């Protein structure tokens, strides 16, 4: 996850925190991509994300299908196929498997290796799995599939065809982004590894013993990238090294995350004798000291040795085929038939729209600018905030049953390197365990309300629980395009400003529009650096037009864009995609438009590419008329 700039900056004569609250939901290495490219590695399962410049509206999207004819019942052959595919993919590594399911056999998974996964260094460019799956999917007669299965088919085909088209770009793959990288995520994954029975503990210990081998394999792949000049810039390598060293300082301590969290979880497992507990504690300490710590140290050594090997610098477009890889990132996460140039124009027009909205509000009431600095949600308790959000969203979002969740805090050793907040989705057969992590150093108490709207209600936790209740094909939990998942969470986060109890609706709208504008500035910079070749100075010149007059802000933004290309776009372009869908529905339904019903349409569809959302919107609009 990207570490967002945390400075106060003037925008439109208004002070605003420029930090975008990003969650870990689907900040994940794509399991399908890793598995099918024979570069299998740990899936980061955070199951725990009308234009004013004259641009045409995207109503005429690429059609996913030519017919809406569907069967009244599920096609059992198709169900069997996609369930087997789900089982094959999850069997690739144990952490992914355990994160998604508590009882693998109930999902047809009877054979799996207890491993964190490995890159296949001998065949990194093998794309045969893509072609095989595409061929099988196309062999199904679409008219024999139920409506739900047709969505699964469309989503799978779109994903596989996109991966096949760009499968030659494997050299860009890395798991060592400064704040979304596996070196940061792994301790959190281990902390959230559920212990329900002794088998879970045994497998957990075995996974700890695989950390050094896992990083050794990763080092070999990074060496391959370095030999071709694709290794990260020294500035980024230094950041990763620093975060690894920070983890190493406390990893083996009694009160460190790897020891204390394990001991806490151990105490909650039924049926363990005092001797069992003592033995497991000793095994954990041994595994951490003999495998986890040496593994992280070897990662530091590898990064240090490869510094200076990078032949290129700056955004992706400065690398051979880098612009094409950026196109792949947007296509993969959004699935929206737009070119990067069109996305860039969409961001520009959205900035204009939000700024005009703020100007209009200020013209109606000039005192609103003076009141802006006093804006507050007046709530700081996480549980109280989530309770309040659950109550306030009922007019705009369909209700779901009560959800059990736990509020947790990122360990001190990881605070400087992880995102402001994150949501871990529950196992599919254990939906009552939901965890929301808060980074105390990345999120102030005054920012918790929109942060928890993003992570909880009506963001990730709400959307995850709603989707699970629709009984989707299991494979869709893995697919879950980031543009939908993070776009939804960002979209509702902006809406949450309307729930602030300021007694001034105009002020709430002003703050929401201001925040949305800042998000768009980040997406603009992401595109600028990675597709148009902006330098750090270009970033500064651009943001200085909006009052960002501190060059250190531009510096941090620039390296955030370089470290994790497309990550901001996933949030912001996804958010704008939902805004465009809403605008189309409002335009065609006029006074018959109902916001709650619109949100239900989005939620009923579940995480899919935006082309699929647009393609199915007309049928929903027809029902609403």
Feature roles, as predicted:
Residues 1, 25, 30-31, 146:
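Intrinsic low-complexity/disordered segments
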Residues 3-23:
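Short, Lys/Arg-enriched N-terminal segments with co-localized hydrophobic residues
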Residues 13-16, 37, 48:
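Generic detector of N-terminal low-structure segments
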Residues 26-27, 45, 443, 449:
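N-terminal hydrophobic alpha-helix used for membrane targeting or insertion
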Residues 26-43:
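Bacterial N-terminal signal peptides that target proteins for export
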Residues 51-54:
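C-terminal motif of bacterial Sec signal peptides marking the signal peptidase cleavage site
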Residues 57-625:
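N-terminal maturation segment of proteins
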């Amino acid at each position: 996850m990207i570490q967002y700039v945390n400075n106060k900056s003037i925008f439109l004569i208004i002070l605003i925190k420029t930090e975008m609250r990003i969650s870990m939901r689907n900040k994940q290495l794509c399991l399908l991509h890793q598995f099918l490219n024979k570069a299998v590695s740990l899936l980061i399962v955070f199951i725990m994300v009308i234009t004013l410049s004259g641009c045409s509206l995207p109503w005429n999207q690429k059609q996913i299908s030519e017919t809406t004819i569907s069967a009244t019942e599920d096609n059992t052959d198709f169900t069997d196929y996609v369930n087997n595919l789900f089982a094959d993919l999850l069997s690739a590594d144990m952490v992914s498997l355990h994160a998604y399911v508590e009882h693998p056999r109930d999902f047809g998974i009877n054979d799996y290796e207890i491993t964190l996964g490995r890159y296949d260094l001998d065949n990194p460019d093998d794309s045969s799995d893509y072609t095989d799956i595409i061929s099988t999917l196309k062999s199904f007669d679409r008219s024999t599939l139920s409506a739900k299965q047709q969505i699964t088919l469309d989503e799978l085909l779109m994903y596989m065809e996109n991966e096949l088209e760009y499968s030659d770009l494997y050299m860009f793959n890395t798991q060592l982004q400064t704040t979304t990288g596996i070196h940061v995520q792994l301790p959190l994954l281990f902390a959230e590894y559920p212990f329900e029975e002794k088998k879970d503990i045994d497998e957990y210990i075995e996974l700890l013993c695989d950390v050094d081998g896992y990083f050794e394999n990763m080092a070999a792949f990074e060496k391959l990238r370095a030999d071709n000049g694709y290794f990260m810039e020294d500035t980024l390598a230094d950041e990763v090294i620093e975060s690894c060293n920070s983890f190493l300082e406390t990893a083996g301590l009694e009160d460190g995350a790897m020891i204390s969290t394990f001991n806490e979880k151990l105490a909650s497992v039924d049926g363990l004798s005092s001797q069992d507990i003592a033995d497991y504690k000793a095994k954990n300490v041994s595994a951490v000291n003999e495998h986890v710590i040496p593994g992280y140290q070897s990662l530091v050594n590898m990064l240090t040795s490869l510094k200076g090997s990078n032949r290129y610098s700056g955004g992706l477009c400065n690398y051979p085929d880098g612009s094409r890889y950026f196109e792949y990132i947007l296509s993969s996460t959004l699935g929206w038939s737009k070119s990067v140039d069109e996305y860039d124009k969409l961001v520009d027009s959205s900035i204009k729209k939000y700024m005009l909205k703020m100007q209009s509000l200020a013209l109606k009431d000039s005192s609103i600018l003076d009141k802006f600095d006093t804006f507050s949600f007046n709530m700081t308790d996480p549980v109280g905030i989530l309770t309040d959000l659950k109550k306030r969203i009922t007019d705009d979002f369909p209700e779901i049953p009560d959800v059990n969740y736990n509020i947790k805090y990122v360990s001190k050793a990881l605070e400087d390197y992880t995102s402001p907040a994150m949501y871990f989705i529950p196992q599919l057969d254990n939906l009552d365990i939901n965890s929301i992590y808060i980074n105390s150093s990345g999120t102030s108490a005054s920012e918790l309300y929109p942060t928890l709207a993003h992570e909880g209600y009506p963001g990730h936790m709400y959307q995850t629980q709603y989707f699970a209740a629709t009984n989707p094909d299991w494979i869709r939990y893995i697919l879950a395009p980031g543009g939908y998942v993070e776009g939804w969470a960002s979209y509702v986060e902006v809406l949450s400003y309307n729930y602030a109890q300021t007694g001034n609706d105009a002020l709430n709208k002003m703050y929401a529009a201001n925040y949305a504008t800042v998000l768009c500035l980040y997406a603009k910079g992401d595109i600028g650096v990675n597709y148009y070749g902006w330098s750090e100075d270009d970033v500064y010149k651009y943001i200085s037009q909006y009052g960002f007059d501190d060059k250190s802000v531009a510096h941090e933004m620039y390296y955030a864009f370089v470290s994790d290309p497309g990550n901001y776009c996933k949030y912001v372009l996804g958010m704008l995609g939902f805004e465009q869908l809403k605008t189309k529905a409002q335009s065609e339904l006029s006074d018959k438009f109902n916001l709650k019903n619109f949100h239900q349409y989005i939620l009923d569809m579940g995480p899919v590419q935006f082309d699929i959302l647009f393609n199915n919107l007309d049928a929903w609009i027809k029902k609403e008329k």
